[in-house]
A protein has these predicted regions:
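NAD(P)+-binding Rossmann beta1-loop-alpha1 motif at the extreme N-terminus of oxidoreductases
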Residues: 1-53, 189-191
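Small-residue helix-packing motif on alpha-helices
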Residues: 30, 40, 58, 194-201, ...
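Rossmann-like NAD(P)(H) cofactor-binding subdomain of soluble oxidoreductases
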Residues: 37, 46-47, 55-60, 64-131, ...
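Internal alpha-helical scaffold of NAD(P)-dependent oxidoreductase catalytic cores
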Residues: 102-112, 128-165, 178-215
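A short glycine-threonine-serine/GTX helix/turn-capping micro-motif
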Residues: 166-175, 196, 224
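NAD(P)-dependent Rossmann-like dehydrogenase/reductase catalytic/cofactor-binding core
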Residues: 203-256
Length: 256
């Protein structure tokens, strides 16, 4: 079965790259639409997939359609292509705030609809994606969707009521992590370390720490305690972070 993308920006490109690397689809089984010939040329050169400037061609030639345009263009795109949609199609939205009910309504008929929230680390094959689907999507079809998202990271199926939480803890948080890496690097630079080297130390520390959480299954607090020696510099740093509201600031940012 062919797969289609309406829009082919950074996120769609990351998703397609993952699918191709894992061998889920061949290049000629993926069709993407772009607004401009320049965009189509870029997609062909970077990904080697079939390209078109016509969104209708994507829908007519595939049964699994990803909406990979910016959220403000969703309604316009669905109004454009809903005449070609059939009950055999599965429509996948990857934009925040577009609910399953909203997507189904804008499709103009009862359809198989999936909502997913990938994040920017998908661009390096380390994404985290939350997925939910309406009742028309079979377990087998949902498994197929998850195989796709697993090709560029990890996947969790969640009830739709948690998708806003997914957006916060997974979609927005990379920006906060980048700020933390930058702050750690700044501190190292202040002590004389070259900036490029400081970024390496800070980023690898976060990468390794994250892998410890995922691979050991231990509670993050327990892992933290393992690093904190009595009367040591690490526990003193923890004290300073707690004093300055580190946890509260993160909590409030994710609640916003």
């Amino acid at each position: 079965m062919k797969i289609g993308f309406i829009g082919c920006g950074n996120m769609a490109s990351a998703m397609i790259s993952g699918m191709l690397k894992k061998g889920l689809y061949k290049k000629d089984e993926i069709i993407v639409s772009n607004l401009t010939e320049e965009g189509s040329k870029r997609s062909r050169e970077k990904l080697g997939v079939v390209t078109t400037l016509d969104n209708h061609e994507v829908v007519k030639n595939t049964k699994l359609v990803f909406l990979a345009v910016k959220p403000q263009f969703y309604e316009e795109v669905l109004n454009e292509v809903k005449g070609e949609l059939t009950p055999e199609h599965t429509v996948v939205g990857i934009a925040p705030g577009k609910t399953l009910a909203w997507l189904e309504e804008k499709c103009g008929q009862p359809l198989k609809v999936v909502r997913m929230m990938p994040n920017t680390p998908a661009q390096v094959g380390e994404g985290m994606t939350g997925v939910c689907a309406n009742e028309k999507v079979s377990a087998e079809e949902l498994t197929q969707i998850c195989e796709i998202t697993d090709s560029f990271g990890r996947t969790e199926v969640v009830p739709e009521r948690l998708m806003d939480a997914v957006s916060a803890v997974s979609g927005c948080s990379p920006a906060y992590v980048f700020m933390f890496i930058e702050a750690m690097a700044d501190a190292a630079v202040a002590q004389g370390m070259p900036r490029k080297q400081a970024y390496q130390f800070a980023a690898q520390a976060l990468l390794g720490s994250a892998k410890m959480v995922l691979e050991t299954g231990m509670h993050p607090g327990e892992l933290k305690d393992m690093v904190c020696s009595p009367a040591g510099t690490t526990i003193e740093g923890v004290r300073i972070l707690e004093k300055n509201g580190f946890r509260s600031a993160v909590f409030e940012a994710l609640q916003g």
